[in-house]
């Protein structure tokens, strides 16, 4: 049996998973990652703690699997995207804490770019909207606000990277300063049409080109780990940002295939093939994980409050003691009794982009119970995802592509059968839950397996993908459309006059 190791560095934890060549999990390990909140709206991580926890889980996973590093054919890395690290090339020490993707400190820079009328330029090159979410403005903040850093950067003494770059630098002892196209595409500095750092965008934000890592395909021979770290050198063969890695792990290799990750929020990606498409529905264009030097693209949208609405039921309303109780409570009534919840706790993301929206619960009567509210809360996740998917389908159809035929799902909340069935009903297409739901880590393992010869092609990987359960729609198209109309009416009520 051949084995692959996936390093899955996330926002709240570092994880490592050993897979066999059939895509089965052999062993896994996880360590929590402390969050640092220096000011309201600021979120940081300690880069050395990221490295320490990731290395520790890799060692633990190998130990649990009863394997040595020499038994591992290759290693893949997947990571929280956009989070920004700058370090000294000579020592490998960071100059500051990592600025996490959720951090909003660069909003003033983004406002200036909008005032300068740079939105069309940036979207045409990067596929992104101007937002503090992306790495470029975080990097500018570090250059402008950490004493001495700009001068050091201009002398070529510093390196920038997203978390994948940082881990590869540490794994190789500084021999490798690289990233993959999917992570590069989230910086707002990378031209996704040419697959290169964009000189005009670097100049716009005042970023020296010497800071930037080499960009490689997501499946490639990156280098090897230092032998002393794990007991033997392991080839680094695959790298992708978490959402693109999940798309790959779901075997969504062809245009029109899509996945939705149901976590605290929801992340939906649709593969759009080799043609760059600009969304007319408020979605992002991003690089998909690439196995060759030729660009491949995906359309992306995110729901801010997905599974977090269940946490609110528990912690805010005290309607449930634990998140696992929500399905039974919601199933204790046949429907929501006319109750509609729009959980716009932090505004609404794609496709609405209403930052000033606030959460609402409508349709309450004397007969409304906590079970109706729980059901409406669960259904809100499906409504938001359906609105996002319908926007993606409109973009696909307008560019001459076929609408989506099925949706593949992953993430913690996809275990909720009630939610998945309602999602299929709203969309009118099958919803497929995979046998292996650790699709983010699996994607990294697949990418490493391709470059190291474990797999011959993505066709072989497609043949390995298995659904654990398929949810078929049980509602007619007219009934589903009526429900979506009620949802859109509720969304319009979230912005106060």
From Swiss-Prot:
Residues annotated for ADP binding in this entry: 11, 15, 264, 307, 412, 416
InterPro entries named among the record's database cross-references: ATPase_NBD, Carb_kinase_FGGY, Carb_kinase_FGGY_CS, FGGY_C, FGGY_N, Glycerol_kin
Positions with a binding annotation for ATP: 11-13, 264, 307, 311, 412
Catalytic activity: glycerol + ATP = sn-glycerol 3-phosphate + ADP + H(+)
GO terms assigned for molecular function: ATP binding; glycerol kinase activity
Family: Belongs to the FGGY kinase family.
Function field: Key enzyme in the regulation of glycerol uptake and metabolism. Catalyzes the phosphorylation of glycerol to yield sn-glycerol 3-phosphate.
Protein name: Glycerol kinase
Taxonomic placement: Bacteria, Pseudomonadati, Pseudomonadota, Betaproteobacteria, Burkholderiales
Protein encoded by which gene: glpK
